[in-house]
Amino acid sequence: MDIIGRAKKELAEYVAAQLGISEEEVFKNITYPPREELGDLSLALPSLIKGNINEKAKLLQEYKGELIERIEVAGIYLNARLNLRNIFVSIFSKLDDSYGLEKIEKPKRIVVEHTSANPIHPLHIGHLRNTILGDALARALKARGHSVNVRFYVNDTGRQVAVLIYGLKLLGFPDPEPNVKKDLWLGIIYAMTNVILEIRKLREELKKLSESEYREKVRELDELIVIANDLRNRNEVLFDKLADAINAKEEPEKEIGEIIKKYEEGNDELKGIIRKYISYALEGFSETLSKLNIRFDNFDYESDLLWENMVNEVLKALLSSSAKIPYKGVIALDLDSFLGDEARSKLRIPKGLKIPPLVLMRSDGTTLYTVRDIAYTIFKFNQFNADFVINVIAEEQYIPQIQLRGALELLGYSRFAENLLHYSYGMVNIQGLRMSGRLGKIITIDEIYEKLDNIVRNKLKEKGGNMENIDDIANAALRYAILSVSANKPLSFDLNRITSFEQNSGPYLQYTYARAANILAKSTENLSMDKVDFSDLVGDKRNILILIAKFPEVFKNAVDNLRLEDLVAFLRELSDIFNSWYDKERVLQEQDPRKRMLRLYIVKGVSVVLKNGLSVLGIRSLERM
């Protein structure tokens, strides 16, 4: 029930008939005036009228329809006022719990892949934006009526997993410590193993360097030793056991390479071992993500792509391509020459962008991750019979994602290439928290969530709030902080500020909903359209009604354009105006029953819009805070 859409259509039909132009052309040019006093809808006439505007504008002076109250020409603009009474009746005579969540006419089958963290340590601050963006996109697309499949790509064949398994092997393949979260336990072993290997490697390099190179490497070694000492302080016995075992080995890197090779070949013994420890990591991930109410439909293992020969089939096809070239001693694809202007346009690749050669294999014959991504993309499209695949991946993967689309085009998967979308996002920083060191200290999502929980708990204690809501409020704070900013912009926020109950936060939207719900819960009246005083539909009440009317359009555009920040901004604006109004005018205490009835309807509309908007974002609306 898109009331604003109907009003725009009504205006477009009239203007098109008067000017003798297409209704579609008029409709797409209808905008909102910058100031309320100018009107509710606006048209820039030069975009529609060629020649003498004033002469043609005379045809547009008089009009009154069902949803359009009146129109007027001001200079080069045609401005229209909505019929508030009819807008009100149209909305509230049919208002239900699904209001605004407009279903798309032709739903698609869409895969959303997000998070896909390496299963070697807990999810950390670097994954936070990815996982919330991905989950919210999936929820929004489902709410729009699409069939959505949410997937997690388990990268279990790379060097990082092999380093973890090597460390576990040296420790005798132990079981996780009983009082430590499993992914955290694995992360400590991985970090210890990795830093010990790095220190050993650097010390070997120092023996072969010139004096200037030596000084630079010594500084790097000093940094590693600081990290190693910090890790040792966390568990001296574990660290020393690993250090002694690694330093006693002649060629640890060769042994790690053998782990990679054997696992890729499908060695049965190694498969059982690695899958066991990977399951521990995924168990930890699921525990963390459950706090944010995030679930996946499928976990896809990279190793399965290798064992089922999907990667080899892709590699064979790429190696037989005419775009194959030698490049720095290895084999690569010259996608830059292969992709012409038409293909670049179709695949959303900037015309002048120089695409680096796509390296297919290392010098040792092993494939690179982009080749595996090609196989995985084909798998995702085919396995779900998908119309679109959305990869939620950081902006640093911009070029690899372009190479991926180019390679799919080269292989003849033109539809897949065109309908593979890279949902890119910038870095996130939480003020006062720092990732320190590439080998040791990470800030986990669990730690962030615990800090948020404590902040929310203290604020609720101060306010005498409902302590049962702590997790829901913490979740709302995180989701709002991330979803309120355009994904391609860098993001920085403060945990204290994002838990504010007063303004511009997830808890603030929840508080606004609870405020509206409380008013409705206290009312003993049944809503009746016959008892409404429409003359009271002025000021903030008028503005709130128009926002309620706009919600279906805002929802549709936000989801269709994958711009959830627009939905967040809308909900914030609605909350601001509602709270401003309620602080000035009473609802239940209003003595005039007809004015009171109108105000109850307005409160009801706000509560439905907030509840539905929050649900799309994955935020729970709370009846009491």
From Swiss-Prot:
Coiled coil: none annotated. GO terms for biological process: arginyl-tRNA aminoacylation. The keyword Nucleotide-binding applies. It is an enzyme of class 6 (ligase). Its main location: cytoplasm. It is found in: Cytoplasm. It catalyses: tRNA(Arg) + L-arginine + ATP = L-arginyl-tRNA(Arg) + AMP + diphosphate. It holds the Pfam family tRNA-synt_1d. GO terms for cellular component: cytoplasm. Its EC number is 6.1.1.19. Keywords: Aminoacyl-tRNA synthetase, ATP-binding, Cytoplasm, Ligase, Nucleotide-binding, Protein biosynthesis. Gene3D superfamilies: Arginyl tRNA synthetase N-terminal domain (3.30.1360.70), HUPs (3.40.50.620), Isoleucyl-tRNA Synthetase, Domain 1 (1.10.730.10). GO terms for molecular function: arginine-tRNA ligase activity; ATP binding. A motif ('HIGH' region) lies at residues 117-127. HAMAP family: Arg_tRNA_synth. Belongs to the class-I aminoacyl-tRNA synthetase family. This is Arginine--tRNA ligase. The gene is argS.
